[in-house]
């Protein structure tokens, strides 16, 4: 049934008695034509206007007073046209079809045809007949997530909405406003009874409003919550919640907002996801290492700038051997580009020469790359000699740089610092893979290392099973506003993933050579000579390896004795396989470093790239030259140059026990070899002799006496 509206004329009261008003009729295209059975001459003086809202009435069933006002597209004023356009734009932007009252004219027929086309379009999308359909996408005609084509031709649709609401909020979105959630369309659920909304018929002397079909006031959105707009507008009630509901629905303030298709929505979602993930810390898979210790040098750490300067200098110094034509390192002297032997130099001193100090500007120079820290100076001592030592020890140049100089901007792969653990006040930096140690040393120790370097290199060449520490480089860094720091790079004595259950620092002396009570309570305690004797157990190497060990100790001690060096010690780490499942201790080697002014280690990982496992004692070495440094383009050592792995580091950097009651895994090496028998040590010897007696075994003795006592003690604890 059609909705009948009545209009009230504004005219001369004197003529009102002669005029009879009749209901208007609906013409084509929804145009309303008033029927006035009076003199046509009077029609020009009549102006039709909408009737005022009737007084509210209360219904016992729904407690709702509704007034249905049909919006029409008339040409009376420009304001009416703008209102109608805003309403139609809202309907089109939300891709929803708002039904008109039932009518016998062609308006409802056109609406029903358009609804049928929408259903057919949705079926085609579900069947995959349209090219822009995404798999498993749910097609909802009235949903904002649907990318169904918009209906742009529905300019003459009738909309049952509250005009006052539209005037209050011109961008009001009919499909997104759920201020009346009680109105639910149960077309998708036929089992659930549908409760028709009670309508109210109000009759006055001049107005008749009828609503007979409740379904015409609902929005057809396929089972979703519908919205009714026949709620009466009360000027005394605030309607600010309409704006709140509208904003909460996620709609734009503009009625002509741009709709996104499926590909655009997926791209936008991907960008938002990447933005969220960029603020999250990256997930780092850390390999469990039981011998990890020290503090990671994070960005902002006091040693952060020092670490970056050290890494920048090492990359430039060690990278010279990897220089290529046209690169920065290609401009350095040719003698640093290739691996060379001492015999290739006419003068022996030229092999141990050090280049000039290089200045690193922040912006970079022709010889250096740009860096993030301030300007600093860097000195590389004896690069030819240390590079040749790295070759003999089987250390690949690329692996060496990756272990030490692979810190990222976010702090990943940074060095680990063990600050000032010993009496010397030195700092220790461990590489992120725990292969190498960077130790700061004083000037006199750096000078001693340069002085003994020729004898040390010759000893390593002739003694592949040497237990002496393995040095890989000596450098000096001087920040622009700071003091210069000298540091040496060595191998870690405990590179294994196995837990070191016990540690012993043995010198062969007795005075002051016992761990304190407080130290013994710590899991990282390093025991000393008296503790080892009280252990009443020996190191079981087997008869053959025992003799090899004693012979090698004699040769090493002979070298140190000739260099006037004393106060060194044998560091022993013991791993018990039957205690494999015990939790790792919080900080390993800390007590060892506290007892030692130097922490050098002869160990290295057997699996280093470019490494050849060759052993002179067993005769199973390979002199094919396959182990030469493949990172250089220049000459390499001849085929008779042999790369050796110590016989006491064949089993993951250590040696397994042979005999004894329990299975044990030993890690052995001599440490603290950069200590001369200087005037200070002589004064210490005199003082302790007077205090404890001449017959007492004290540490500060002459190099000859120290070497003899050291060898004698070790021969008694090895089986």
From Swiss-Prot:
Its EC number is 2.7.1.-. SMART domains: PIPKc. Residues 107-129 have a biased composition (Basic and acidic residues). The modification Phosphothreonine is found at residue 262. Residues 172-184, 218-228, 248-261 have a biased composition (Polar residues). Keywords: ATP-binding, Kinase, Nucleotide-binding, Phosphoprotein, Transferase. The keyword Glycosyltransferase does not apply. This is Probable phosphatidylinositol phosphate kinase DDB_G0267588. It comes from Dictyostelium discoideum (Social amoeba).
């Amino acid at each position: 049934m059609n909705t009948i509206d009545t209009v009230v004329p504004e005219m001369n009261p004197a003529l009102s008695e002669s005029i009879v008003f009749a209901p208007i009729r609906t013409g084509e295209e929804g145009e309303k034509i008033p029927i006035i059975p009076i003199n046509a001459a009077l029609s020009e003086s009549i102006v039709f206007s909408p009737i005022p809202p009737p007084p509210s009435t209360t219904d016992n069933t729904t407690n709702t007073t509704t007034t249905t006002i049909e919006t029409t597209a008339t040409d009376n004023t420009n304001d009416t046209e703008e209102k109608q356009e805003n309403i139609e734009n809202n309907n089109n932007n939300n891709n929803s079809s708002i039904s008109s009252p039932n009518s016998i004219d062609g308006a409802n027929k056109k609406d029903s045809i358009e609804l049928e086309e929408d259903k057919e379009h949705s079926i085609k999308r579900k069947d995959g007949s349209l090219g822009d359909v995404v798999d498993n996408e749910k097609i909802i005609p009235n949903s904002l997530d649907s990318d169904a084509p918009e209906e742009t031709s529905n300019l003459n649709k009738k909309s049952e909405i509250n005009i006052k609401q539209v005037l209050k909020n011109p961008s009001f979105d009919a499909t997104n406003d759920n201020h009346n959630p009680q109105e639910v369309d149960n077309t998708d659920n036929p089992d659930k009874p549908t409760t028709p909304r009670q309508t109210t018929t109000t009759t006055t002397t001049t107005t008749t409003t009828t609503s007979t079909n409740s379904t015409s006031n609902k929005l057809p959105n396929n089972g979703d919550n519908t919205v009714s707009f026949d709620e009466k507008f009360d000027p005394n009630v605030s309607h600010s919640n309409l704006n709140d509901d509208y904003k909460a629905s996620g709609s734009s303030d503009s009625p002509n907002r741009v709709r996104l298709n499926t590909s655009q929505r997926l791209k936008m979602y991907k960008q938002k996801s990447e933005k969220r993930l960029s603020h999250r810390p990256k997930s780092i898979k850390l390999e469990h290492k039981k011998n990890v210790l020290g503090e990671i040098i994070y960005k902002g750490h006091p040693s952060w700038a020092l670490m970056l300067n050290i890494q920048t200098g090492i990359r430039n110094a060690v990278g010279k051997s990897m220089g290529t034509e046209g690169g920065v390192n290609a401009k350095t002297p040719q003698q640093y580009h290739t691996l060379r032997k001492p015999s290739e130099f006419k003068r022996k001193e030229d092999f141990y020469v050090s280049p000039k100090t290089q200045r690193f500007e922040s912006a970079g120079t022709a010889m250096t790359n740009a860096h993030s820290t301030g300007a600093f100076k860097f000195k590389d001592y004896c690069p030819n000699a240390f590079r040749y030592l790295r070759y003999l020890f089987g250390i690949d140049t690329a692996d060496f740089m990756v272990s030490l100089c692979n810190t990222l901007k976010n702090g990943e792969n940074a060095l680990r610092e063990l600050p000032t653990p010993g009496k010397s006040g030195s700092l220790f930096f461990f590489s992120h893979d725990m292969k190498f140690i960077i130790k700061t040393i004083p000037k006199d120790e750096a000078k001693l290392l340069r002085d003994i370097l020729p004898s040390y290199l010759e000893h390593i060449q002739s003694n592949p099973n040497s237990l002496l520490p393995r040095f890989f480089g000596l450098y000096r860094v001087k920040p622009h506003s700071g003091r210069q720091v000298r540091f040496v790079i060595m191998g870690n004595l405990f590179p294994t993933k196995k837990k070191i259950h016990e540690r012993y620092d043995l010198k062969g002396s007795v005075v002051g050579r016992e761990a304190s009570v407080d130290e013994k309570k710590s899991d990282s305690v390093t025991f000393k000579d008296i503790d080892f004797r009280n252990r009443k157990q020996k190191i079981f190497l087997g008869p053959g390896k025992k003799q090899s060990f004693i012979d090698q100790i004699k040769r090493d001690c002979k070298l140190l004795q000739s260099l006037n060096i004393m106060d060194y010690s044998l560091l022993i780490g013991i791993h018990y396989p039957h205690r494999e499942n015990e939790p790792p201790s919080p900080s390993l080697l800390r007590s060892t470093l506290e007892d030692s002014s130097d922490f050098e280690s002869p160990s290295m990982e057997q699996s280093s790239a470019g490494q050849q496992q060759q052993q002179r004692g067993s005769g199973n070495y390979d002199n094919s030259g396959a182990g030469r440094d493949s990172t250089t383009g220049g000459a390499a050592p001849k085929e008779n140059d042999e790369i050796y792995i110590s016989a006491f580091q064949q089993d993951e950097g250590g040696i397994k026990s042979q005999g004894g009651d329990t299975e044990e895994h030993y890690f052995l090496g001599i440490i603290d070899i950069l200590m001369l028998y200087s005037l200070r040590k002589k004064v210490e010897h005199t003082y302790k002799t007077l205090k404890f007696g001449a017959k007492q075994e004290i540490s500060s003795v002459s190099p000859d006496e120290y070497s003899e006592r050291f060898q004698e003690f070790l021969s008694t604890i090895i089986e």
